[in-house]
Amino acid sequence: MAPLDLEEILKKHKAAKAEAAKPRFIPRGQRKKMEEEKKLKVEEEQKRQQEELQKTRSELQKAREELAGLQRVRRQEQSRSRESDHSVPTGPRAMRSYDDDSFNGNGNGSNSNRNNNNNQRDRQDASTKTNGSRTAEEVQEEKKYLERYTGPPAKVSTFSANKKRRRTTDQKFNFDWDPKDDTSQPWRYEETGAHERSANGATEQVRRKKATRDYNDPRLVPWQDKELSQMTTRDWRLFKVNLEIVTKGNNIPNPMRFWEESNLPHVLKDTIKQVGYTEPTPVQRAAIPIALQCRDLIGISKTGSGKTAAFVLPMLSYIEPLPPLNEVTKTEGPYALILAPTRELATQIQAEVIKFATRMGFTVVCLIGNKRTIEEDAFALRNGAEIIVATPGRLVDCLERHLLVLSQCSYVVLDEADRMVDGGFEDSIHKILAALPPSNGKPDDRDAEDPNIMSKFLTPNLRYRQTVMYSATMPPSVERIAKNYLKHPAMVTIGTIGEAVDTVEQQAMWVVSEDERRNKLRAMLNTYGTGKLVIVFVNTKSNCDAVAKDLKSSSFSAVTLHGNKTQDQREAALQSFRDGRTNVLVATDVAARGLDIPDVSLVINFNMAGTIEVYTHRIGRTGRAGKEGMAITFCGPEDHGVLYHLKQIMSKSQMSKVPPWLKDHPEAQSKPTF
């Protein structure tokens, strides 16, 4: 007999498994026959179960009858044993002390009765003497024992009028004055001592609980004072609840508590200290450990939460092991790609990346339209770049003109994905992601969740492509992109989607005319905006220039930011505003999202946003990084469609108060149906 070939057996097994996994067509008649067989099996199984149940019931009934028969036999035997007992009857207990002669007719019955009575009197006298020799406390103690074990004597009431009166009046408030009360002085509840008496029991309970508390219990130690190895499952759960971190997915690592505990390279940790990042934000705590495991990631967080560093640091850590670009590899494109919806946000991200990438020797190139021509972009790419930050439109132009390829791109970031889709860049995103090399795509199975497999190098210059998406909301269009291009992603949600920043005080004012709107704007700037950075949002470009001109005529220093400005003009306006040379920035929604301008203390919505989502992002320009801010909104008759949502979002804020006009407005009472 020839020896078994293990490879042949495995090959046959694999072929059989693949054959079984293939879908096969089943004719209609065969399907009907299979359904009938399945139905017949179900009926047979039900019939078998009923028979077993009936059999069990009959056995129980038979056992019950046997037990009853045994009990009858036992009673009969006891009855026969009583009948066979021939002992002399003793008679009634009261007559046992009589002499036998009294029953024999000797006429001595009366003497016996007298003797019995005398004996009873003697016993009573002895009992009285015994009771007399005991103290009153002993007698009372005996009565208590008797009442405890035998109950109170018959026909003896246990009612206590004092107890009932105290029980019924304890919780009642006395509205009448006592004749002894001094009504000339104001009555003070604290002076009566009633609050002390009512809280006495609770205070004593708290005192006892504190006295018995074990202060060495590790559960009472805050997570900041614990070593990483001492953190329990309960500690991590409370940690995530306190920071409003919600994660979804398999094999999610625990969040990062401190920068020192992260697995980032030492060069990045040193740079973090130099730039002054003392403590990670919630999105950084949750997202960085997941991204460092080479997992695809979807991050949903409110504006101003530190999302840029949350994807920049893992990106640099991922491409650090790749070799430096040379004359050959520099033509293959970048190692990492970051897409942003606006030119301002792309420029801001480039500045953030340069902070950390310079010490690692990486080159960062920003591709945005309007600032420079396509030829200038080609010149910037002549020596290659490890990292490219771009807007979707300009990057598609570079790809179509063959100025750039993405043959070795291993890390892709989609920042503000919902904003890119809303801006009409969905087709551009699909074109860019389709231009990525399929050779380093992740498998669409559980291997995509295994960090050991995903961290492998496919070639010396190529790793599995990791895709990261950040957004403030998750509309269906963004979900489609995530479903098509992200493989088994982990999801991180910080706070509640669509809510405003908790550190912003919101105010809303009703205005009727344009003149009233301008007068209130000047009044708010004089009241709250003196010496502070203020952003004024308008809905149209023409109105943006008109409002800025009106403010300048009122001796306010103002600059404008809208889509008709060139890139140089927009950057100059932003730089002037950041430096404090101008304290009022009048802008359209182009500055509503993504821009991180520190120390903005006031946002004024000269025109209410068309949707509550845009409103949320507008007021998110202030109150960033834990600082407090204020947002003032002017509403008019044209804003009826968003009044309900504005009322809801203001009522959820602990720092804001819904004004009476908005609370009672008819359009704010029910959700609009359009």
UniProtKB/Swiss-Prot annotation:
- The Helicase C-terminal domain covers 520-666
Task: List the ranges annotated as motif Q motif.
Answer: 257-285
* Motif DEAD box, chain ranges: 415-418
GO cellular component labels = cytoplasm; nucleus
Q: Which residues bind ATP?
A: S301, K302, T303, G304, S305, G306, K307, T308
- Where is this chain primarily localised? cytoplasm
Q: How is this protein named in the record? A: Pre-mRNA-splicing ATP-dependent RNA helicase PRP28
User: What gene name is given for the protein in this entry?
Assistant: PRP28
